[in-house]
């Protein structure tokens, strides 16, 4: 292992689902808009404003191109959390007098689930659909859940915890046939997997800048123009972004977001090949050296930059402490402060014991083969040590069912 350390910088970043480092090309494009090109894009009376507006519109076009949309259908927001809130609350407010039912999945991101819970208090009926043990939606259950009161179906493209890719095309077809709006939080899939809003009949899509090697604090919402979808804005003000999101646009962040989208558009295939190769290398080496390791979520229908693994018999928190040379997480970054087992893992039927042993490893554009090999060696040696110390692992080897143990409180 010492030999491996020569050209490695520790800790190794493996938390690409929570955020990504800024691509140097993105940073370079942003810098002038912090210094000499500082105009307000809404100032129409001088060249500083025109220059900023042109930069914003170029970025808007690039973001639209990545999902096959028209640039007029892209609204800038502060991130995917705001976009999700704007869709779910805004569409319910606009159409709530006509239809009052929204469908989503139990495994959606917390901001979607909590926005839905907020609406329940306002009298909107929410259906939280279960998912199959592989993490994928059951399309028959979706079909049966839609009623004549259903306004919106909200299903994320790629799950942030387990990486599974939902069948967006099939969901979009069902929604279009039943005249229901289809929203997808595509933050984890945008720029990583091909997504076309017209082919998939997506009416609204939430996007984040910092998941695609762009800056934090900027995101977007795609809102279909034909057939037109309406939302009531959350923020009132000067009427920017076609009245849907008032406030002065942050030109440097938008420029960075646009360049990040352009790079993703041009290099998506190259990035995917790189990530897929490292995924296979990582997983095959782990499987060959450690018994009783489980990949959570469907192995094939997933974005392979996400490996959520359960290591039976060892607590996730103790693994994180043992492998502190790797920046990883247990659960999503938004909920990793909680000691509760991940609600996403519980929703695919994983036992509480196994859910507590889960770690999410992220692979991205800047991950190297050397880093993967170092990570595998470190994980294997530490898991082996932790299992030797673990009475739970010992009991499992003796065939004792942990569910039947009666624990004594002290």
From Swiss-Prot:
The gene is iscS. Pathway: Cofactor biosynthesis; iron-sulfur cluster biosynthesis. The active site is at 334 (cysteine persulfide intermediate). Its cofactor is pyridoxal 5'-phosphate. Belongs to the class-V pyridoxal-phosphate-dependent aminotransferase family. NifS/IscS subfamily. It is found in: Cytoplasm. This is Cysteine desulfurase IscS. PANTHER family: CYSTEINE DESULFURASE, CYSTEINE DESULFURYLASE FAMILY MEMBER. Its main location: cytoplasm. Its EC number is 2.8.1.7. Pyridoxal 5'-phosphate binds at residues 80-81, 160, 188, 208-210, 248. The modification N6-(pyridoxal phosphate)lysine is found at residue 211. It catalyses: (sulfur carrier)-H + L-cysteine = (sulfur carrier)-SH + L-alanine. InterPro entries: Aminotrans_V_dom (IPR000192), Aminotrans_V_PyrdxlP_BS (IPR020578), Cys_deSase_IscS (IPR010240), Cysteine_dSase (IPR016454), PyrdxlP-dep_Trfase (IPR015424), PyrdxlP-dep_Trfase_major (IPR015421), PyrdxlP-dep_Trfase_small (IPR015422). PROSITE patterns: AA_TRANSFER_CLASS_5. Homodimer. Forms a heterotetramer with IscU, interacts with other sulfur acceptors. GO terms for cellular component: L-cysteine desulfurase complex. Master enzyme that delivers sulfur to a number of partners involved in Fe-S cluster assembly, tRNA modification or cofactor biosynthesis. Catalyzes the removal of elemental sulfur atoms from cysteine to produce alanine. Functions as a sulfur delivery protein for Fe-S cluster synthesis onto IscU, an Fe-S scaffold assembly protein, as well as other S acceptor proteins. One of its GO terms (biological process) is [2Fe-2S] cluster assembly. GO terms for molecular function: 2 iron, 2 sulfur cluster binding; cysteine desulfurase activity; metal ion binding; pyridoxal phosphate binding. Gene3D superfamilies: Aspartate Aminotransferase, domain 1, Type I PLP-dependent aspartate aminotransferase-like (Major domain). [2Fe-2S] cluster binds at residue 334.
């Amino acid at each position: 292992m010492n030999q491996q350390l020569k050209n490695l910088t520790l800790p190794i970043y493996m938390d690409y689902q929570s955020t990504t480092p800024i691509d140097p090309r993105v940073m370079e494009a942003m810098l002038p808009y912090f210094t000499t090109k500082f105009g307000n894009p809404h100032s129409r009376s001088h060249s500083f404003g025109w220059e900023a507006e042109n930069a914003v519109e170029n970025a808007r076009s690039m973001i639209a191109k990545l999902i096959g949309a028209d640039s007029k259908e892209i609204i800038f927001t502060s991130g995917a959390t705001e976009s999700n809130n704007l869709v779910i609350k805004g569409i319910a407010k606009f159409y709530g007098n006509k239809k009052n039912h929204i469908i989503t999945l139990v495994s959606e991101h917390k901001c979607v689930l909590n926005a839905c819970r907020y609406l329940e208090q306002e009298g909107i009926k929410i259906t939280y659909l279960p998912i199959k043990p592989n993490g994928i939606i059951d399309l028959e259950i979706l079909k049966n859940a839609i009623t004549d009161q259903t306004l919106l179906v909200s299903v994320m493209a790629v799950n942030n915890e387990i990486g599974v890719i939902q069948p967006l095309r099939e969901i979009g077809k069902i929604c279009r046939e039943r005249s229901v709006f289809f929203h997808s939080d595509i933050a984890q899939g945008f720029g990583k997997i091909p997504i076309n809003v017209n082919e998939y009949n997506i009416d609204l899509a939430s996007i984040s800048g910092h998941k695609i090697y762009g800056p934090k604090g900027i995101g977007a919402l795609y809102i279909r123009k034909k057939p037109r979808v309406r939302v009531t804005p959350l923020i009132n003000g000067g009427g920017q972004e076609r009245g849907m999101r008032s406030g002065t646009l942050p030109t440097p962040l938008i420029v960075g977001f646009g360049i990040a989208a352009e790079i993703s558009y041009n290099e998506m295939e190259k990035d995917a090949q790189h990530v897929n190769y490292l995924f296979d290398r990582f997983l095959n080496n782990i499987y060959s050296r450690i018994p009783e390791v489980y990949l959570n979520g469907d192995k094939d229908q997933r974005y392979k930059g996400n490996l959520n693994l359960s290591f039976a018999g060892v607590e996730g928190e103790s693994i994180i402490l043992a492998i502190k040379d790797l920046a990883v997480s247990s659960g999503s970054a938004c909920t990793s402060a909680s000691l509760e087992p991940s609600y996403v893992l519980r929703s695919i039927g994983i036992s509480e014991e196994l859910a507590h042993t889960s770690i999410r490893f992220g692979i991205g554009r800047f991950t190297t083969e050397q880093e993967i090999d170092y990570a595998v060696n470190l994980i294997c040696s530490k898991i082996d040590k932790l299992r030797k110390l673990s009475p739970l692992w010992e009991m499992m080897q003796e065939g004792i069912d942990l569910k039947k143990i009666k624990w004594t409180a002290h």
